[in-house]
Amino acid sequence: MTVLRHAVVGLAFAAGVMGSAPAHADSEFPFGLEMTLEVRPQPGSKRIPRLEIGDNGEAQLDLWCKAGKGQFSVANNTVIFVPGAMQDSGCTPERAQADDALVNALVEAATWTRQGDFVSFVGATTLRFRVNTN
């Protein structure tokens, strides 16, 4: 009877610990998620850069004006981003320059961190994205 009681208490404790785990761990890279850059829209636009990372690291970028694809490779907190071809949809020089700077910052990022719904790519410039939860 004592063994049975200990087993029930142990199972109840394990269920409580497992039940309190978050839906995503802070240490998980955001594969399969869409994120939005934490910035204000540029003057005259409502568009904010968005990044969607597939389950295998393939990425779709929708920036201030340009759109394109890329590939993320991740090992622990190290990240490598390789951009693909970008499509220019009649960008103003200012928006094209902002898009190029954003892609370059992703390329230069060496590490990444995640705190809740925020993912940061850290290099010479830190880019902070919010995971879209809706």
Residue locations for each model-derived region?
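Lipid interaction determinants
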Residues: 2-11, 16-134
